[in-house]
A protein has these predicted regions:
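Hydrophobic pocket/interface hotspot
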Residues: 33, 44-45, 53, 64, ...
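Sec-dependent signal peptide recognition
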Residues: 1-8
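Short, low-complexity N-terminal intrinsically disordered segments enriched in polar/charged residues
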Residues: 4, 16-51, 149-150
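Short beta-strand edge/turn micro-motifs at domain boundaries
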Residues: 120-148
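Hydrophobic/aromatic beta-strand elements that line small-molecule binding cavities or substrate pockets
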Residues: 33, 68-73, 85-90, 103-104, ...
Length: 150
């Protein structure tokens, strides 16, 4: 029941923000995106990606929904858990929104018996309103520190 109420609240928030002259609630949008990562819902994550999304992390730069979906979402999703963000800066207008801050994540072992790790770093997510008035992730950049053993 709680999940249904939360879903209805999110849907109402996103629907009310779809008017041409209103900005989105970026914190709610990013929490829904992070929630999809934590529930390992690749379909929902990929649904947030713009067709021309760019992803940057260190020397990796991937462009387009297909490449970002395969190389970031599908390859990373099974290796992490408990993703948390701490917002440092955010802003919105009628057509764009961004959030930047720090993240922390559990890095899951690659094989049974190996230790878990802990990762942290900085992030920025840039969202743009699409032609159909839904918000899509247009740019994601992660800069992380070396993974620490737990």
């Amino acid at each position: 029941m709680k999940a249904l109420l939360y879903s209805l609240l999110v849907a109402a928030t996103l629907t009310s923000c779809s008017k041409a002259d209103e900005a989105v609630n970026i914190q709610s949008l990013n929490q829904e995106f992070i929630g999809a990562w934590n529930s390992k819902d690749s379909g929902k994550i990929n649904g947030f990606l713009a067709d021309d999304v760019s992803f940057v992390q260190g020397s990796a730069h991937w462009k387009g929904k297909g490449e970002v979906s395969q190389k970031w979402v599908n390859e990373t999703l099974p290796t992490i858990g408990n993703l948390k963000t701490s917002v440092v800066s955010s802003s919105t207008d009628a057509n764009t929104a961004y959030e930047a801050g720090t993240f922390a994540v559990d890095v899951l072992p690659e094989a049974p018996g190996e230790p878990r790790g802990y990762g942290e770093g900085n992030y920025i997510f840039l969202w743009k309103k699409s032609d159909d008035k839904t918000w899509k992730l247009s740019y994601a950049q992660l800069e992380d520190l070396p993974v620490q053993r737990r």
